[in-house]
Curated annotation (Swiss-Prot):
Top EC class, one word: lyase
Keywords of the record: Lyase, Pyridoxal phosphate, Schiff base
Protein name: Pyridoxal 5'-phosphate synthase subunit PdxS
Sites where the protein binds D-glyceraldehyde 3-phosphate: 166
Catalytic residues (UniProt): 82
Residues engaged in binding D-ribose 5-phosphate: 25, 154, 215, 236-237
A Gene Ontology molecular function term of the record: pyridoxal 5'-phosphate synthase (glutamine hydrolysing) activity
Pathway where this protein functions: Cofactor biosynthesis; pyridoxal 5'-phosphate biosynthesis
PROSITE patterns to which the protein is assigned, alphabetical: PDXS_SNZ_1, PDXS_SNZ_2
Matches recorded under SUPFAM superfamilies: Ribulose-phoshate binding barrel
Organism of derivation: Staphylococcus carnosus (strain TM300)
GO BP terms in the entry: amino acid metabolic process; pyridoxal phosphate biosynthetic process; pyridoxine biosynthetic process
Disulfide bonds: none
Length: 295
């Protein structure tokens, strides 16, 4: 009997259901409940938020399954969990637990520096990071059902997420007006599957949702990314490293939904305490930049 895998249509449909929403990193059941009450469409269960992973250094692995299970038991919204790039067993364990999505994440220390997971081989849908159309198309070709900007996680600095969202969108726009006989050469140049690029050209958009992630620290950041074309927002360290996580969580959800209501966003910001402390990305060495992981 052949093994069962989820179809691309079903997986992508599940991801589409999160469109326009906020997905929040949580490290325990209590935080997961705060996120759910604030209006998050899903939570990402992990042992440490990206800023703590960055500060601790060393090897960052998949979350203890016990924490993932506790979060799954605590909330009714979808639960995501991260695995290391290329780590088949971490992904299979999460799949066996029944998580709703797996994030093959550059936030964790890569297990394989040459190969990403063949995500089409799993029943559970995957989300992956990308900085440009080449990375986006490769992940889609492997079976990713959802994309997000890599940004620079754990910095509270939105600049890299902005760069990556603009880069992907500009390259998609370029592709849509490209003559068909040039697509193969373009595919070779950016190392992307021809079939994926042809589909993007024919439809005028990516075949999967693309969320903003990596550096979202304020309601204004979330609204900015939505204005730039993000389908939704991931918030990692920004909420639970702020002065008032409950207020921050609700404010970011509101700002994501009403991202052109500047009066509302201004009022939300006035009621908040201090945001997480940020890092200047330019001061990070190449080895410290999580966005450089994967290919």
């Amino acid at each position: 009997m052949s093994k069962q895998v989820g179809s691309d249509r079903v997986k992508r449909g599940m991801a589409e259901m999160q469109k326009g929403g906020v997905i929040m990193d949580v490290v325990n059941a209590e935080q997961a409940k705060i996120a759910e009450e604030a209006g998050a469409v899903a939570v990402m269960a992990l042992e440490r938020v990206p800023s703590d992973i960055r500060a601790a250094g060393g090897v960052a692995r998949a979350c203890n399954p016990k924490i993932v299970q506790e979060v799954m038991d605590a909330v009714s919204i979808p639960v995501m969990a991260k695995c290391r790039i290329g780590h088949i067993t971490e992904a299979r364990v999460l799949e066996s637990m029944g998580v709703d999505y797996i994030d093959e994440s550059e936030v964790l220390t890569p297990a394989d520096e040459e190969y990403h997971l063949l995500k089409s081989d799993y029943t559970v849908p995957f989300v992956c990071g990308c900085r440009n159309l080449g990375e986006a198309a490769r992940r889609i070709g492997e079976g990713a059902a959802m994309l997000r900007t890599k940004g620079e996680p754990g910095t509270g600095n939105i600049v890299e997420a902005v760069r990556h969202m603009r880069q992907v969108n500009s390259e998609v726009a370029k592709l849509t007006v490209m003559p068909d006989d040039e697509i193969m050469t373009f595919a070779k140049e950016i190392g992307a599957p021809y079939e994926v690029l042809k589909s993007i050209k024919d439809n005028g958009r990516l075949p999967v949702v693309n969320f903003a992630a990596g550096g979202v620290a304020t309601p204004q950041d979330a609204a900015l990314m939505m204005q730039l074309g993000a389908d939704g927002v991931f918030v990692g360290s920004g909420i639970f490293k702020s002065e008032d996580p409950e207020k921050f969580a609700k404010a970011i959800v509101q700002a994501t939904t009403h991202y052109t209501d500047y009066e509302l966003i201004g009022k939300l910001a006035q009621e908040l305490g201090e945001a997480m402390r940020g890092l200047d990305v330019n001061q990070l060495s190449l080895e410290e930049r999580m966005q450089e992981r994967g290919w």
